[in-house]
């Protein structure tokens, strides 16, 4: 059987000499892995993580790993490797996709969201965009946070906390008696205009980190690339 799609290469692992297994996040078919051969300098350039490609997958049976062929559409590599923050953010994002998105599981609209993020990241790193990507990944895996209104009173003002149980925002008055048991809702997630302080970055990463660990990563074993990114942002970024 054959599958043709457009996708982003998110993983490349050596199999044997000049042969690799790539994983591609496709537009219409979810994650797909296939064996590729690098027979020239051109093919080495094509099969790089972050490249957007026309993707052809062929196998006798659907459950086989299959043979893959790609044609390059666009490469972001040159924009990412020259900036440590961009590179760490990119590595973190694709490591999360590999961990949280299952092979051949379709996610509607996720591909366009990923493309938009990569395009923006290639131009400039934005912490707000990064956190929104993590929140989107949580939502795509079934753990959407509702930060638009208070989960108790439904008011949309003075939102200050997030309940670790319901994943819903809480107003200051509702959450105050239980503040030691609640997560902080960073102000920048409520307004596109506000500047982001280092403390708010810490709060945001703590927020997504909590739900990643509670629902998706056993024994708090997150991808090393995300840990590297978080450490860099909180100490350098």
From Swiss-Prot:
Highest taxon in the source lineage: Bacteria
Keyword field contains DNA repair: yes
Keywords: DNA damage, DNA recombination, DNA repair
Cellular component GO terms, alphabetical: bacterial nucleoid
Gene Ontology BP terms: DNA recombination; double-strand break repair
Signal peptide region: none
Entry's family note: Belongs to the RecO family.
HAMAP family referenced in this protein's UniProt entry, alphabetically: RecO
Function: Involved in DNA repair and RecF pathway recombination.
Protein's name according to its UniProt entry: DNA repair protein RecO
Organism: Rickettsia akari (strain Hartford)
Taxonomic path: Bacteria, Pseudomonadati, Pseudomonadota, Alphaproteobacteria, Rickettsiales
């Amino acid at each position: 059987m054959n599958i043709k799609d457009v996708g982003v290469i998110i993983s490349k692992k050596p199999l044997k000499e000049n042969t690799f297994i790539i994983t591609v996040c496709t537009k219409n078919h979810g994650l797909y892995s296939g064996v590729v051969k690098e027979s020239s300098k051109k093919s080495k350039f094509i099969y790089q993580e972050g490249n957007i490609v026309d993707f052809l997958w062929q196998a006798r049976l659907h459950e086989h790993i299959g043979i893959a062929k790609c044609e390059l559409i666009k490469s972001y590599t040159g924009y990412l490797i020259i900036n440590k923050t961009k590179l760490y953010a990119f590595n973190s994002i694709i490591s999360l996709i590999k961990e949280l998105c299952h092979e051949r599981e379709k996610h509607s609209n996720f591909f366009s969201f990923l493309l938009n993020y990569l395009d923006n990241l290639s131009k400039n790193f934005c912490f707000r965009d990064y956190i929104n990507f993590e929140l989107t990944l949580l939502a795509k895996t079934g753990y959407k946070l509702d930060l638009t209104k208070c989960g108790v009173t439904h008011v949309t003002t003075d939102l200050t906390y997030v309940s670790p149980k319901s994943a819903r925002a809480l107003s200051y008055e509702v959450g105050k008696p239980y503040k030691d048991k609640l997560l902080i809702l960073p102000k920048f997630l409520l307004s596109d205009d506000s500047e982001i302080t280092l403390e708010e970055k810490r709060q945001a990463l703590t927020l997504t980190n909590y739900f990643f660990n509670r629902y998706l990563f056993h024994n708090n074993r997150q991808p090393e690339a995300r840990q590297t990114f978080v450490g860099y942002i909180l100490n350098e970024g």
